[in-house]
A protein has these predicted regions:
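Hinge-like oligomerization/junction regions that interrupt long coiled-coil arms in large cytoskeletal
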Residues: 3-166
Length: 166
């Protein structure tokens, strides 16, 4: 138990409490950060793109997520976001394929991480609409060309949101 607490040091209390239940609940898989590998070059961009979602908890199914929500409520441990494999799927969401051919674009964030095939729907859901660019000038040019409709992150972690905020 101590090892789990140390492993999730820096995570919210609710996340640690749920992960302490992992040995008793086969349907608890882990937090998003446990399920992806990222090359050093892309680490800052991916961390920025994920934001708080890096602590989301992946479960096998909705039943496990529901049980863990009840556990958190019963014990007043707080809230957590659960991503059941049986219901979360982000494949096919990105519509502006032409944007991926623009100068300075490295690809969609979900294509720049490694994960097991069974978790690809999760990474597509969380990262499949975020374009990664080399530099902020590339991101600004891209955002303007596509009328500020894209989610864009740079290698240094600058984030441009639809609507134009940076």
């Amino acid at each position: 138990l101590k090892n789990i607490a140390e492993r999730y040091d820096g995570y919210g209390n609710s996340i640690r409490k749920v992960m302490e239940q992992k040995s008793d609940h086969k349907g608890l898989i882990g937090v998003v950060s446990d399920l992806i590998q990222v090359d050093k070059k892309y680490e800052i961009a991916i961390e920025t793109a994920l934001g708080g979602n890096i602590q989301n908890i992946v479960t096998e199914d909705e039943k496990t997520a529901k049980e863990m929500i009840a556990f958190l409520k019963k014990n007043r441990f707080g809230r957590a976001t659960f991503l059941p494999l049986t219901s979360v799927d982000g494949t096919g969401n990105f519509k502006n394929k032409d944007a991926l051919e623009e100068p300075g674009v490295l690809g969609l964030a979900n294509q720049l991480v490694k994960t097991e095939p069974k978790y690809e729907g999760i990474t597509a859901y969380l990262l499949g609409r975020v374009i990664v660019t080399e530099q902020i000038d590339d991101a600004i040019r891209l955002a303007g060309k596509y009328r500020y409709t894209l989610h864009i992150v740079t290698l240094e972690g600058e984030y441009l949101s639809p609507g134009g905020s940076m």
